[in-house]
Amino acid sequence: MDDLQSQNLSMDMTDSPPALANNRLENGMAQLITTEAWNINSTDLVKKALVTVPAPSILNPPAESQSGMALKVAATVLQPLCLGESPVVMPIHMQVEGSSAPELNPNGNATYVMTTQGPVQLPVVLEQHVFQHLNSPLVLPQEAPCSSSTIHNNLFQGAEDPEAQPQLLDLRIPSQPQEPTLPFEAVLQNLFPSQGTLGPPPCQPPPGYAPVPPQPFSSPLSPLVPPATLLVPYPVIVPLPVPVPIPIPIPMPQSSESKFSSSFPKPPSSFGLHPFKGTQTPLEKDELKPFDILQPKEYFQLSRHTVIKMGSENEALDLSMKSVPWLKAGEVSPPIFQEDAALDLSVAAHRKSEPPPETLYDSGASVDSSGHTVMEKLPSGMEISFAPATSHEAPAMMDSHISSSDAATEMLSQPNHPSGEVKAENNIEMVGESQAAKVIVSVEDAVPTIFCGKIKGLSGVSTKNFSFKREDSVLQGYDINSQGEESMGNAEPLRKPIKNRSIKLKKVNSQEIHMLPIKKQRLATFFPRK
Protein backbone atom coordinates (compact mmCIF):
# COMPACT_ATOMS: atom_id res chain seq x y z
CA MET A 1 0.00 0.00 0.00
CA ASP A 2 2.85 2.35 0.75
CA ASP A 3 4.23 1.65 -2.72
CA LEU A 4 0.84 2.35 -4.24
CA GLN A 5 0.49 5.55 -2.28
CA SER A 6 3.94 6.78 -3.28
CA GLN A 7 3.25 5.91 -6.91
CA ASN A 8 -0.01 7.83 -6.87
CA LEU A 9 1.74 10.73 -5.19
CA SER A 10 4.43 10.85 -7.87
CA MET A 11 1.83 10.67 -10.59
CA ASP A 12 -0.10 13.49 -9.01
CA MET A 13 2.93 15.73 -8.85
CA THR A 14 4.54 15.16 -12.29
CA ASP A 15 2.36 13.48 -14.84
CA SER A 16 0.08 15.25 -17.26
CA PRO A 17 -3.67 14.63 -17.11
CA PRO A 18 -3.76 12.15 -20.08
CA ALA A 19 -0.85 10.19 -18.66
CA LEU A 20 -2.48 10.24 -15.23
CA ALA A 21 -5.66 8.79 -16.67
CA ASN A 22 -3.79 6.06 -18.43
CA ASN A 23 -1.90 5.24 -15.27
CA ARG A 24 -5.17 4.92 -13.39
CA LEU A 25 -6.55 2.57 -15.95
CA GLU A 26 -3.45 0.41 -15.76
CA ASN A 27 -3.44 0.20 -12.03
CA GLY A 28 -7.19 -0.30 -11.81
CA MET A 29 -7.36 2.12 -8.89
CA ALA A 30 -9.15 5.38 -8.45
CA GLN A 31 -7.07 8.41 -7.61
CA LEU A 32 -7.51 9.54 -4.05
CA ILE A 33 -6.56 12.86 -2.60
CA THR A 34 -3.29 12.05 -0.87
CA THR A 35 -1.81 13.11 2.44
CA GLU A 36 -1.23 16.56 1.01
CA ALA A 37 -4.98 17.07 1.30
CA TRP A 38 -4.74 17.24 5.08
CA ASN A 39 -2.52 20.31 4.86
CA ILE A 40 -4.34 22.29 2.18
CA ASN A 41 -7.67 24.10 2.19
CA SER A 42 -10.80 23.22 0.27
CA THR A 43 -10.06 25.56 -2.69
CA ASP A 44 -6.86 23.66 -3.45
CA LEU A 45 -8.85 20.44 -3.30
CA VAL A 46 -11.30 21.81 -5.82
CA LYS A 47 -8.52 22.91 -8.16
CA LYS A 48 -6.75 19.57 -7.90
CA ALA A 49 -9.98 17.74 -8.59
CA LEU A 50 -10.67 19.87 -11.65
CA VAL A 51 -7.15 19.26 -12.93
CA THR A 52 -6.97 15.58 -12.20
CA VAL A 53 -10.33 14.01 -12.85
CA PRO A 54 -11.40 15.25 -16.36
CA ALA A 55 -9.49 12.57 -18.28
CA PRO A 56 -10.90 10.85 -21.38
CA SER A 57 -12.63 7.63 -20.52
CA ILE A 58 -12.30 4.50 -22.58
CA LEU A 59 -15.92 3.51 -22.38
CA ASN A 60 -17.34 6.99 -23.02
CA PRO A 61 -14.90 9.18 -25.00
CA PRO A 62 -17.33 11.96 -26.04
CA ALA A 63 -18.47 12.49 -22.45
CA GLU A 64 -15.75 14.96 -21.51
CA SER A 65 -18.11 17.90 -21.44
CA GLN A 66 -20.55 15.93 -19.33
CA SER A 67 -17.75 15.00 -16.94
CA GLY A 68 -16.71 18.63 -16.76
CA MET A 69 -20.24 19.65 -15.78
CA ALA A 70 -20.34 16.99 -13.13
CA LEU A 71 -17.03 18.08 -11.68
CA LYS A 72 -18.11 21.70 -11.57
CA VAL A 73 -21.10 20.64 -9.56
CA ALA A 74 -18.88 18.47 -7.44
CA ALA A 75 -16.66 21.39 -6.57
CA THR A 76 -19.30 22.78 -4.24
CA VAL A 77 -19.85 19.40 -2.61
CA LEU A 78 -16.30 18.23 -2.12
CA GLN A 79 -15.54 18.81 1.58
CA PRO A 80 -13.58 16.79 4.10
CA LEU A 81 -15.92 14.70 6.23
CA CYS A 82 -15.21 14.48 9.95
CA LEU A 83 -15.59 10.88 11.02
CA GLY A 84 -14.68 10.69 14.67
CA GLU A 85 -11.35 12.36 15.35
CA SER A 86 -9.84 12.51 11.82
CA PRO A 87 -11.39 13.97 8.65
CA VAL A 88 -12.02 11.56 5.77
CA VAL A 89 -12.30 12.92 2.21
CA MET A 90 -14.48 10.70 0.06
CA PRO A 91 -14.01 10.43 -3.71
CA ILE A 92 -15.94 12.77 -5.94
CA HIS A 93 -17.87 10.02 -7.68
CA MET A 94 -19.32 9.06 -4.32
CA GLN A 95 -20.76 12.56 -3.84
CA VAL A 96 -22.04 13.35 -7.32
CA GLU A 97 -24.23 11.17 -9.46
CA GLY A 98 -23.70 10.93 -13.20
CA SER A 99 -19.95 11.48 -13.15
CA SER A 100 -17.96 9.21 -15.43
CA ALA A 101 -15.52 8.06 -12.82
CA PRO A 102 -12.59 5.90 -13.89
CA GLU A 103 -13.27 3.18 -11.32
CA LEU A 104 -15.40 1.40 -13.90
CA ASN A 105 -12.47 -0.40 -15.41
CA PRO A 106 -12.78 -4.18 -15.49
CA ASN A 107 -9.54 -4.80 -13.65
CA GLY A 108 -10.61 -3.60 -10.20
CA ASN A 109 -13.06 -1.32 -8.42
CA ALA A 110 -11.58 -0.84 -4.97
CA THR A 111 -10.96 2.64 -3.53
CA TYR A 112 -9.10 3.97 -0.53
CA VAL A 113 -10.24 5.82 2.56
CA MET A 114 -7.58 7.72 4.48
CA THR A 115 -7.59 7.03 8.21
CA THR A 116 -5.05 7.42 10.96
CA GLN A 117 -3.84 3.90 10.21
CA GLY A 118 -3.23 4.67 6.57
CA PRO A 119 -5.35 4.15 3.44
CA VAL A 120 -7.86 1.31 3.74
CA GLN A 121 -9.24 -0.42 0.67
CA LEU A 122 -13.05 -0.37 0.69
CA PRO A 123 -15.61 -1.36 -1.90
CA VAL A 124 -18.12 1.14 -3.16
CA VAL A 125 -20.93 -0.52 -1.24
CA LEU A 126 -19.16 -0.14 2.07
CA GLU A 127 -18.41 3.49 1.29
CA GLN A 128 -22.12 4.04 0.96
CA HIS A 129 -22.61 2.33 4.31
CA VAL A 130 -20.28 4.85 5.86
CA PHE A 131 -22.74 7.54 4.89
CA GLN A 132 -25.58 5.41 6.18
CA HIS A 133 -23.82 5.16 9.54
CA LEU A 134 -23.24 8.87 9.52
CA ASN A 135 -26.97 9.45 9.13
CA SER A 136 -27.88 6.98 11.85
CA PRO A 137 -27.12 7.53 15.58
CA LEU A 138 -24.32 5.02 15.84
CA VAL A 139 -23.70 5.58 19.52
CA LEU A 140 -27.08 4.19 20.52
CA PRO A 141 -26.92 0.40 20.34
CA GLN A 142 -30.66 -0.07 20.12
CA GLU A 143 -30.60 1.28 16.58
CA ALA A 144 -28.90 -1.98 15.47
CA PRO A 145 -26.64 -0.61 12.69
CA CYS A 146 -25.01 -3.95 12.07
CA SER A 147 -28.21 -5.69 11.12
CA SER A 148 -29.01 -3.05 8.53
CA SER A 149 -25.46 -3.08 7.19
CA THR A 150 -25.48 -6.84 6.76
CA ILE A 151 -28.76 -6.59 4.88
CA HIS A 152 -27.28 -4.01 2.51
CA ASN A 153 -24.14 -6.06 2.11
CA ASN A 154 -26.22 -9.03 1.06
CA LEU A 155 -28.15 -6.86 -1.35
CA PHE A 156 -25.12 -5.38 -3.02
CA GLN A 157 -22.93 -8.46 -2.95
CA GLY A 158 -25.48 -10.59 -4.81
CA ALA A 159 -26.21 -8.25 -7.69
CA GLU A 160 -25.88 -4.52 -8.16
CA ASP A 161 -29.08 -2.91 -9.34
CA PRO A 162 -28.35 -0.48 -12.20
CA GLU A 163 -31.13 1.87 -11.08
CA ALA A 164 -29.66 1.98 -7.57
CA GLN A 165 -26.18 2.80 -8.94
CA PRO A 166 -26.58 5.21 -11.89
CA GLN A 167 -22.89 6.13 -11.97
CA LEU A 168 -21.97 2.52 -12.88
CA LEU A 169 -23.36 3.11 -16.41
CA ASP A 170 -25.19 -0.25 -16.72
CA LEU A 171 -22.17 -2.27 -15.82
CA ARG A 172 -22.28 -5.02 -13.20
CA ILE A 173 -19.43 -5.47 -10.80
CA PRO A 174 -18.08 -8.90 -11.80
CA SER A 175 -16.99 -10.09 -8.42
CA GLN A 176 -17.25 -8.33 -5.09
CA PRO A 177 -14.16 -8.93 -2.94
CA GLN A 178 -14.91 -10.74 0.34
CA GLU A 179 -12.06 -9.41 2.43
CA PRO A 180 -13.20 -5.84 3.20
CA THR A 181 -15.39 -6.83 6.14
CA LEU A 182 -12.39 -6.84 8.40
CA PRO A 183 -11.00 -3.48 7.20
CA PHE A 184 -14.45 -1.91 7.57
CA GLU A 185 -14.51 -3.03 11.18
CA ALA A 186 -11.12 -1.47 11.64
CA VAL A 187 -12.35 1.77 10.08
CA LEU A 188 -15.40 1.95 12.30
CA GLN A 189 -13.40 1.13 15.39
CA ASN A 190 -10.94 3.80 14.37
CA LEU A 191 -13.60 6.37 13.64
CA PHE A 192 -15.70 5.46 16.68
CA PRO A 193 -13.33 4.18 19.37
CA SER A 194 -16.02 4.18 22.03
CA GLN A 195 -18.06 1.70 20.06
CA GLY A 196 -15.74 -1.18 20.91
CA THR A 197 -16.48 -0.85 24.61
CA LEU A 198 -20.23 -0.98 24.16
CA GLY A 199 -20.50 -4.50 22.86
CA PRO A 200 -19.51 -6.83 19.99
CA PRO A 201 -17.96 -5.53 16.75
CA PRO A 202 -20.44 -3.38 14.85
CA CYS A 203 -20.67 -5.48 11.72
CA GLN A 204 -20.82 -8.82 13.46
CA PRO A 205 -24.07 -8.93 15.41
CA PRO A 206 -24.37 -11.53 18.17
CA PRO A 207 -26.01 -14.82 17.25
CA GLY A 208 -29.77 -14.86 17.36
CA TYR A 209 -29.92 -11.09 17.25
CA ALA A 210 -32.87 -9.79 15.32
CA PRO A 211 -33.61 -6.17 14.32
CA VAL A 212 -36.41 -5.76 16.85
CA PRO A 213 -37.81 -2.42 18.04
CA PRO A 214 -35.63 -0.77 20.67
CA GLN A 215 -36.36 -1.72 24.25
CA PRO A 216 -37.24 1.16 26.60
CA PHE A 217 -34.49 2.43 28.89
CA SER A 218 -31.85 0.14 27.35
CA SER A 219 -29.58 2.86 26.01
CA PRO A 220 -26.65 4.37 27.93
CA LEU A 221 -28.66 7.61 28.03
CA SER A 222 -31.49 5.95 29.95
CA PRO A 223 -30.39 7.27 33.39
CA LEU A 224 -30.96 10.75 32.01
CA VAL A 225 -34.56 9.99 31.20
CA PRO A 226 -36.82 10.02 34.27
CA PRO A 227 -39.43 7.31 34.67
CA ALA A 228 -42.87 8.03 33.36
CA THR A 229 -44.37 8.26 36.83
CA LEU A 230 -42.21 11.25 37.70
CA LEU A 231 -43.46 13.15 34.69
CA VAL A 232 -47.08 12.91 35.80
CA PRO A 233 -48.03 15.94 37.91
CA TYR A 234 -50.81 14.43 39.99
CA PRO A 235 -48.68 12.59 42.63
CA VAL A 236 -47.42 15.99 43.66
CA ILE A 237 -50.94 17.34 44.01
CA VAL A 238 -52.39 14.39 45.91
CA PRO A 239 -50.45 14.92 49.19
CA LEU A 240 -51.49 18.56 49.37
CA PRO A 241 -54.73 18.04 51.40
CA VAL A 242 -52.79 16.00 53.98
CA PRO A 243 -51.36 18.95 55.99
CA VAL A 244 -54.82 20.45 56.51
CA PRO A 245 -55.22 20.61 60.31
CA ILE A 246 -58.09 18.70 61.83
CA PRO A 247 -59.63 20.61 64.75
CA ILE A 248 -59.36 18.59 67.93
CA PRO A 249 -61.76 19.64 70.72
CA ILE A 250 -59.14 20.02 73.43
CA PRO A 251 -60.98 22.62 75.58
CA MET A 252 -64.15 20.53 75.72
CA PRO A 253 -63.51 19.09 79.25
CA GLN A 254 -62.94 22.58 80.58
CA SER A 255 -66.06 23.90 78.91
CA SER A 256 -68.10 21.06 80.40
CA GLU A 257 -66.93 22.02 83.87
CA SER A 258 -67.70 25.64 83.18
CA LYS A 259 -71.21 24.75 82.05
CA PHE A 260 -71.70 22.62 85.11
CA SER A 261 -70.39 25.26 87.43
CA SER A 262 -72.28 28.11 85.78
CA SER A 263 -75.51 26.89 87.36
CA PHE A 264 -74.07 27.60 90.80
CA PRO A 265 -73.00 30.98 92.18
CA LYS A 266 -69.19 31.07 92.02
CA PRO A 267 -68.26 27.44 92.75
CA PRO A 268 -64.70 26.53 93.67
CA SER A 269 -62.33 25.34 90.98
CA SER A 270 -62.19 21.82 92.40
CA PHE A 271 -65.95 21.51 92.50
CA GLY A 272 -67.08 17.92 92.22
CA LEU A 273 -63.58 16.51 92.35
CA HIS A 274 -63.69 15.37 95.99
CA PRO A 275 -66.90 13.50 96.82
CA PHE A 276 -68.05 13.25 100.40
CA LYS A 277 -66.65 9.88 101.39
CA GLY A 278 -65.95 8.36 104.75
CA THR A 279 -62.39 7.36 103.95
CA GLN A 280 -60.80 10.69 103.30
CA THR A 281 -57.22 11.11 104.35
CA PRO A 282 -55.55 14.24 105.70
CA LEU A 283 -53.87 14.65 102.30
CA GLU A 284 -57.25 14.94 100.70
CA LYS A 285 -58.19 17.54 103.25
CA ASP A 286 -55.30 19.59 102.03
CA GLU A 287 -56.57 19.18 98.50
CA LEU A 288 -59.76 20.88 99.57
CA LYS A 289 -57.85 24.08 100.07
CA PRO A 290 -58.62 25.40 96.58
CA PHE A 291 -61.67 26.87 98.25
CA ASP A 292 -59.49 29.94 98.64
CA ILE A 293 -60.09 30.76 94.99
CA LEU A 294 -63.65 31.74 95.81
CA GLN A 295 -64.58 35.36 96.04
CA PRO A 296 -65.07 36.44 99.66
CA LYS A 297 -68.45 37.93 98.77
CA GLU A 298 -69.90 34.48 98.60
CA TYR A 299 -68.84 33.68 102.10
CA PHE A 300 -69.13 36.96 103.85
CA GLN A 301 -70.79 35.09 106.68
CA LEU A 302 -68.69 32.23 107.96
CA SER A 303 -70.47 29.65 110.01
CA ARG A 304 -70.03 26.59 112.17
CA HIS A 305 -70.69 23.20 110.54
CA THR A 306 -71.85 20.30 112.59
CA VAL A 307 -71.99 17.01 110.72
CA ILE A 308 -73.20 13.93 112.54
CA LYS A 309 -71.96 10.87 110.73
CA MET A 310 -73.63 7.53 111.36
CA GLY A 311 -70.61 5.27 111.72
CA SER A 312 -71.86 1.97 110.32
CA GLU A 313 -73.97 3.22 107.42
CA ASN A 314 -71.39 5.68 106.06
CA GLU A 315 -74.03 8.40 106.02
CA ALA A 316 -73.57 11.91 107.30
CA LEU A 317 -76.20 14.22 108.74
CA ASP A 318 -75.61 17.82 107.77
CA LEU A 319 -76.30 20.09 110.73
CA SER A 320 -74.24 22.96 109.43
CA MET A 321 -75.13 26.60 109.77
CA LYS A 322 -74.37 28.27 106.49
CA SER A 323 -74.69 31.67 104.99
CA VAL A 324 -74.53 32.13 101.25
CA PRO A 325 -74.95 35.47 99.41
CA TRP A 326 -78.46 36.77 99.68
CA LEU A 327 -81.00 34.38 98.21
CA LYS A 328 -84.75 34.13 98.28
CA ALA A 329 -86.42 32.27 101.06
CA GLY A 330 -88.08 29.67 98.85
CA GLU A 331 -85.05 29.07 96.65
CA VAL A 332 -83.48 25.64 96.98
CA SER A 333 -80.30 24.55 95.26
CA PRO A 334 -80.61 21.49 93.04
CA PRO A 335 -79.38 18.38 94.84
CA ILE A 336 -76.53 16.37 93.38
CA PHE A 337 -76.92 12.67 94.04
CA GLN A 338 -73.87 10.61 94.84
CA GLU A 339 -73.43 7.33 96.63
CA ASP A 340 -71.52 8.40 99.72
CA ALA A 341 -73.83 11.27 100.43
CA ALA A 342 -74.90 13.36 103.36
CA LEU A 343 -78.39 13.82 104.72
CA ASP A 344 -79.39 17.44 104.32
CA LEU A 345 -81.55 18.09 107.36
CA SER A 346 -80.73 21.72 107.87
CA VAL A 347 -83.53 24.11 108.91
CA ALA A 348 -83.25 27.86 108.95
CA ALA A 349 -83.46 29.49 112.37
CA HIS A 350 -84.07 33.21 112.67
CA ARG A 351 -81.36 35.40 114.13
CA LYS A 352 -82.22 38.35 116.27
CA SER A 353 -79.14 40.43 115.68
CA GLU A 354 -77.58 40.06 112.22
CA PRO A 355 -75.23 42.74 111.01
CA PRO A 356 -75.29 43.76 107.33
CA PRO A 357 -73.13 41.60 105.05
CA GLU A 358 -70.80 44.43 104.15
CA THR A 359 -69.84 44.81 107.79
CA LEU A 360 -69.31 41.09 108.11
CA TYR A 361 -67.18 40.96 105.00
CA ASP A 362 -65.07 43.91 105.88
CA SER A 363 -64.41 42.80 109.40
CA GLY A 364 -63.78 39.22 108.28
CA ALA A 365 -65.61 37.96 111.32
CA SER A 366 -67.78 34.96 111.61
CA VAL A 367 -71.49 35.17 112.17
CA ASP A 368 -71.62 32.79 115.09
CA SER A 369 -70.08 33.77 118.35
CA SER A 370 -67.79 31.23 119.88
CA GLY A 371 -68.97 32.00 123.37
CA HIS A 372 -72.55 30.76 123.11
CA THR A 373 -73.74 27.41 124.33
CA VAL A 374 -76.15 25.44 122.19
CA MET A 375 -78.27 22.70 123.68
CA GLU A 376 -79.80 20.41 121.11
CA LYS A 377 -82.43 17.95 122.26
CA LEU A 378 -81.98 14.69 120.48
CA PRO A 379 -84.48 11.81 120.58
CA SER A 380 -84.13 9.28 123.40
CA GLY A 381 -82.85 11.96 125.68
CA MET A 382 -79.63 12.81 123.87
CA GLU A 383 -78.23 16.23 124.48
CA ILE A 384 -75.26 17.87 122.79
CA SER A 385 -73.75 20.72 124.68
CA PHE A 386 -71.70 23.31 122.86
CA ALA A 387 -69.24 24.83 125.27
CA PRO A 388 -66.95 27.71 124.41
CA ALA A 389 -63.30 26.90 124.06
CA THR A 390 -60.47 29.27 124.04
CA SER A 391 -58.16 29.72 121.12
CA HIS A 392 -55.28 28.32 123.15
CA GLU A 393 -56.96 24.96 123.76
CA ALA A 394 -57.28 24.08 120.10
CA PRO A 395 -53.63 24.12 118.97
CA ALA A 396 -52.71 21.92 121.90
CA MET A 397 -54.92 19.14 120.58
CA MET A 398 -54.10 19.69 116.91
CA ASP A 399 -51.92 16.70 116.11
CA SER A 400 -53.79 14.09 118.11
CA HIS A 401 -56.73 13.44 115.84
CA ILE A 402 -55.34 12.72 112.38
CA SER A 403 -57.15 9.53 111.54
CA SER A 404 -58.12 8.77 107.98
CA SER A 405 -61.51 7.34 108.85
CA ASP A 406 -62.87 10.28 110.85
CA ALA A 407 -61.12 13.10 109.03
CA ALA A 408 -62.85 12.07 105.86
CA THR A 409 -66.13 13.88 105.99
CA GLU A 410 -65.36 17.20 107.54
CA MET A 411 -66.39 20.29 105.63
CA LEU A 412 -64.40 23.48 105.61
CA SER A 413 -66.06 26.75 104.90
CA GLN A 414 -64.02 29.37 103.11
CA PRO A 415 -62.34 31.93 105.38
CA ASN A 416 -61.64 35.42 104.19
CA HIS A 417 -58.00 35.07 105.15
CA PRO A 418 -56.28 31.69 104.76
CA SER A 419 -54.84 30.54 108.04
CA GLY A 420 -53.49 27.37 109.58
CA GLU A 421 -55.84 24.49 110.09
CA VAL A 422 -56.33 23.79 113.76
CA LYS A 423 -57.61 20.35 114.66
CA ALA A 424 -58.70 19.26 118.07
CA GLU A 425 -60.03 16.11 119.65
CA ASN A 426 -62.71 15.86 122.25
CA ASN A 427 -64.98 13.21 123.70
CA ILE A 428 -68.57 13.38 122.53
CA GLU A 429 -70.92 10.74 123.71
CA MET A 430 -74.17 10.23 121.97
CA VAL A 431 -76.67 7.41 121.93
CA GLY A 432 -78.17 6.10 118.70
CA GLU A 433 -80.89 3.51 118.65
CA SER A 434 -78.49 0.68 117.86
CA GLN A 435 -75.23 2.33 117.00
CA ALA A 436 -72.69 4.89 118.07
CA ALA A 437 -72.52 8.06 116.02
CA LYS A 438 -69.53 10.08 114.98
CA VAL A 439 -69.89 13.81 115.25
CA ILE A 440 -67.66 15.97 113.13
CA VAL A 441 -67.73 19.68 113.81
CA SER A 442 -66.07 22.28 111.65
CA VAL A 443 -65.85 25.61 113.40
CA GLU A 444 -64.94 28.71 111.46
CA ASP A 445 -65.11 31.18 114.31
CA ALA A 446 -62.28 33.33 115.52
CA VAL A 447 -62.45 31.52 118.86
CA PRO A 448 -63.26 27.88 118.01
CA THR A 449 -66.02 26.12 119.84
CA ILE A 450 -65.33 22.55 120.96
CA PHE A 451 -67.85 19.98 122.04
CA CYS A 452 -67.66 19.46 125.75
CA GLY A 453 -69.60 17.42 128.23
CA LYS A 454 -71.33 14.11 127.76
CA ILE A 455 -74.58 12.97 126.30
CA LYS A 456 -77.18 11.62 128.65
CA GLY A 457 -78.21 7.98 128.52
CA LEU A 458 -74.93 7.03 127.07
CA SER A 459 -74.42 3.62 125.52
CA GLY A 460 -71.45 4.27 123.26
CA VAL A 461 -68.58 6.69 123.10
CA SER A 462 -67.11 8.01 119.84
CA THR A 463 -64.02 10.07 119.37
CA LYS A 464 -64.62 13.01 117.11
CA ASN A 465 -62.42 15.23 115.06
CA PHE A 466 -62.42 18.97 114.82
CA SER A 467 -61.15 21.10 111.98
CA PHE A 468 -60.75 24.80 112.61
CA LYS A 469 -60.07 27.71 110.35
CA ARG A 470 -58.85 30.53 112.51
CA GLU A 471 -59.47 34.07 111.52
CA ASP A 472 -57.41 37.02 112.56
CA SER A 473 -60.27 39.45 112.20
CA VAL A 474 -62.37 41.01 114.90
CA LEU A 475 -65.05 38.85 116.46
CA GLN A 476 -68.62 39.98 116.11
CA GLY A 477 -70.41 39.54 119.41
CA TYR A 478 -73.98 38.39 119.60
CA ASP A 479 -76.50 37.49 122.26
CA ILE A 480 -75.47 34.02 123.36
CA ASN A 481 -78.45 33.24 125.54
CA SER A 482 -80.99 34.16 122.90
CA GLN A 483 -79.17 32.07 120.34
CA GLY A 484 -79.12 29.14 122.71
CA GLU A 485 -82.80 29.50 123.32
CA GLU A 486 -83.44 29.60 119.62
CA SER A 487 -81.42 26.48 119.10
CA MET A 488 -83.23 24.67 121.88
CA GLY A 489 -86.58 25.74 120.50
CA ASN A 490 -85.69 24.82 116.98
CA ALA A 491 -84.31 21.43 117.98
CA GLU A 492 -87.78 20.10 118.73
CA PRO A 493 -88.55 18.99 115.16
CA LEU A 494 -85.39 16.91 115.25
CA ARG A 495 -86.78 14.04 117.28
CA LYS A 496 -89.43 12.61 115.05
CA PRO A 497 -87.43 12.41 111.79
CA ILE A 498 -84.65 10.44 113.40
CA LYS A 499 -87.03 7.89 114.91
CA ASN A 500 -89.01 7.06 111.83
CA ARG A 501 -86.11 7.80 109.42
CA SER A 502 -88.51 9.52 107.04
CA ILE A 503 -85.84 11.92 105.89
CA LYS A 504 -85.30 12.70 102.25
CA LEU A 505 -81.73 11.99 101.33
CA LYS A 506 -79.92 14.87 99.81
CA LYS A 507 -76.65 13.62 98.45
CA VAL A 508 -74.06 16.29 98.28
CA ASN A 509 -70.34 16.38 97.86
CA SER A 510 -67.83 18.17 100.00
CA GLN A 511 -68.33 21.51 98.34
CA GLU A 512 -72.00 21.84 97.65
CA ILE A 513 -72.62 22.05 101.39
CA HIS A 514 -71.22 25.55 101.27
CA MET A 515 -73.81 26.58 98.72
CA LEU A 516 -77.04 25.72 100.47
CA PRO A 517 -79.32 28.72 99.88
CA ILE A 518 -80.62 29.98 103.24
CA LYS A 519 -82.02 33.45 103.50
CA LYS A 520 -80.54 34.36 106.87
CA GLN A 521 -77.97 32.94 109.19
CA ARG A 522 -79.72 30.34 111.35
CA LEU A 523 -78.99 27.41 113.56
CA ALA A 524 -79.08 24.16 111.54
CA THR A 525 -81.65 21.71 112.80
CA PHE A 526 -83.55 18.78 111.36
CA PHE A 527 -86.76 19.21 109.51
CA PRO A 528 -88.91 16.52 107.88
CA ARG A 529 -89.32 16.19 104.14
CA LYS A 530 -91.99 13.96 102.68
UniProtKB/Swiss-Prot annotation:
Domain of life where this protein originates: Eukaryota
InterPro entries: RAI2/SOBP
UniProt name for this protein: Retinoic acid-induced protein 2
Gene Ontology biological process terms, A to Z: animal organ development; embryo development ending in birth or egg hatching
Region Disordered: start-end pairs: 1-22
GO cellular component: nucleus
Comp. bias (Polar residues): 1-13
Gene that encodes the chain: RAI2
Pfam families with a match to the protein in the record: SOBP (PF15279)
